[in-house]
Amino acid sequence: MLKMNLQLFAHKKGVGSSRNGRDSNAQRLGVKRGDGQFVTAGNIIVRQRGTKFHPGKNCGLGKDDTLFATIDGYVKFERKDRSRKQVSIYPERQAAQA
């Protein structure tokens, strides 16, 4: 008795799948209100990771380091000291420009 051992091969090459093709959503960080701009209480001024900008007068710091206005007024970016910057809110435009 004669037995045949047949082996069939694929006629199309198998294609591997890529492990790429994903991307995370942007965090939308940065300065939201510029120097001298009018803001109302609760407006977000800066969204940040860590305290690149520190809160000054009439400015609050959220738990994710977001700076926000606590009163209606004008935004002023100031130097806290040699290496640190702070953001303050002044009710009058003259104080914010000085």
Swiss-Prot record:
InterPro entries the record matches: Ribosomal_bL27 (IPR001684), Ribosomal_bL27_CS (IPR018261)
From the UniProt record, list the residues forming the propeptide: 1-9
Which keywords describe this protein according to UniProt? Ribonucleoprotein, Ribosomal protein
Q: Name one GO cellular component term.
A: cytosolic large ribosomal subunit
- Tell me the Gene Ontology biological-process terms attached to this UniProt entry: translation
PTM section of the record:
The N-terminus is cleaved by ribosomal processing cysteine protease Prp.
MF annotations from Gene Ontology: structural constituent of ribosome
Q: Which family does it belong to?
A: Belongs to the bacterial ribosomal protein bL27 family.
Listed name of the protein = Large ribosomal subunit protein bL27
Native organism is Desulfitobacterium hafniense (strain DSM 10664 / DCB-2)
Lineage runs: Bacteria, Bacillati, Bacillota, Clostridia, Eubacteriales
